């Protein structure tokens, strides 16, 4: 476009973004360069307005020269802002370099700092309150019990000081809460409201500036558009100007005139909008922004003053604490002298004085003087096996306590049994040579004078009738020599209930009658007592209650009741049945009830029964594993059973075997392992006689019990496999051994019949891939038979029948002597105990019988089937060939329960494991 042909009325927009804008120098753009310059101007204008809002107050005070403002004034203001007058105080309005956005961030951080201080005051007040209560509670329960005790008065002085200190800290806590926490909390709320209002005002001011700049932009765009339309109409008119005859020229002229008027109007509007924006920035915007900055500055000053005041007050409260405490301590200094140790000692001696007593000296008494305590049957018996053993199964008294004999200075004998007052028996006067009494009469007189005392199986010394000097271990704890001969004799004397045993019992009864006639009183013992009672007393009381049944218990009745209850309640399915303990009060209450009733019928809590079971074992006066073998057994835990067989009385062995076998089955059927069950039962089964070594030997004690359980577990597993898979080889002349080369028994009919006075041997046959029908019949005129049939589903028909006859384990008998089989007790008939000659030990076997009341009854029976008519037993089984352990073995092999009045069902399992506690 030629400049010469340009319309003088059209103005050109100057190519400067922030230069002055007026109507004299505005002209429409005639090319692309001018159009781009116009767009660049609008962009710079918007950016400038945005920077104005977030720039410093000095920049806002000197905005760009958008109209009417000269460049010189702008430069002067800029130079003045770069120089700060140090003589004047700085302010947010004039000297803030970060602007409005920095103030917003600072106010947010300031509120957070106030909240942190508020939280500190709250926690400190809470801690002071707790400390005050703890101090006051230290001596809150202390009361002066003796007004004459000066030391107690001194302690009360400490209580007074603590109360004073507690009051001081309580006051400090209240001051923090009342004078610091609550006022600061209200101030923070007010500051948050003020900050919110300031932020809203700043946001509104920013929006107003943005709207004003947006209006300038719109008016500029409208103005440029109309200018371009006018230029276009002018070009079209020039092109058509050569053709004067055409009517189009007139139309173009009218269009040009119209666009010219519109562009002039848009130009006026554009100038007016620029003036309004400049006035807003320099007037309203500047004033409102300055006011907002001043309020922010006042907000910060107020906040800092509040923080300073609270910190000063807190320090002042802290200074008051030691001063107040020092005053309290100074006021009580003189009261410390009230404590007079000499006066306290004199008052105590005066109130507890008693005359001086001199103890009588002890006098030695020879060991032979204890011979009157020995059973008369053991002195007069002609059998060497009977004279070398002491019958522990028939205790001579019901007390079951340790008997000590001391000779007083007057020559009388004092017998103390631990359960009653000492009994003093006058000693016989010296007899002259002319008045000598025959030895037999002397013996009778001595028996009449000496009361029948209980021979403690684990602590009192048994007497050697042959006069042999025994070792210290035997004399103190009353155990036999480990020699095989003596152990055989003791076992024979205990298990054979013959005429000699009756004589011993009669002798004990006669001695008791003589003692009653002599006027010497014995302590009255509750026959239902269970806890803290010797095993001998328990078994004697149980047998006396069942005296009319003609049977004697092998273990205490309460032990079988504990096991029955635990099995019936399925304790092996419970978690932590022996670990979870009821409250101590409940245990003590149930122990008192049991001592009165003697039965567990009303207890259904399996955890309570388990706790009572452990308490009963632990309360035994003498532990099951005696003190006599303690050191020996903890040094050799692998030989625990061997040491026990020759080291503790037979009744203790029976009970120990019974408990260990129960634990074996419990471990096998529960989730508990042998080590865990050993840790639980070790403290009640074995006790250290030395208090100092109890902790040092605890691991050794656990190892002993664990080895015993493992040995019983392995023995039981071996016995079960032998009973299931191996034939028992009889040594009877009438028996036939028909084994073929393959190890199977292929006889079509293999039967073995013995007489009434012989023990029948049970043949257990493996019927795998064999066509046979093996029947073993044991004839006994006094019992019926119980049949257990195991049928294997093979290609052939196999039938194994094992008929076992035992007078003790039969529920289908018609004899009156076996009424106890329906009573739920563990019994053994007289004359039917096995006397084993292997290693001097006895092998027992506990089976389970059921009654119509769903009781599971352990019955002590022979490990192998026996049949005896005259009290003597003959074993037809070679235990060496079977590899059976030579020890007393009690097991829970077969368990059955009767859910109705029908016959009991014996359960036998085909897996390799043994004895599964199950109910069918």
Curated annotation (Swiss-Prot):
Q: Which Gene3D superfamilies does the UniProt record give?
A: Arfaptin homology (AH) domain/BAR domain (1.20.1270.60), Rho GTPase activation protein (1.10.555.10)
Phenotype of the disruptant?
Show a strong cytoskeletal phenotype. mgp1-/mgp2- cells have a severe fruiting defect, an overabundance of filopodia and slug motility and function are affected. They empty their contractile vacuoles less efficiently than normal and consequently they have three times the usual number.
Any one Gene Ontology molecular-function term assigned to this protein's record: microtubule binding
Keyword check for Transmembrane helix? no
| Annotated GO biological process | actin filament polymerization; contractile vacuole discharge; contractile vacuole organization; exocytosis; hypotonic response; negative regulation of filopodium assembly; phototaxis; response to differentiation-inducing factor 1
What keywords were assigned to this record? Coiled coil, Cytoplasm, GTPase activation, Vacuole
**GO cellular component terms?**
contractile vacuolar membrane; contractile vacuole; cytoplasm; cytosol; vesicle
Keyword check for Coiled coil, yes or no.
Answer: yes
F-BAR domain residues: 90-344
What is this protein's record name? GTPase activating protein homolog 1
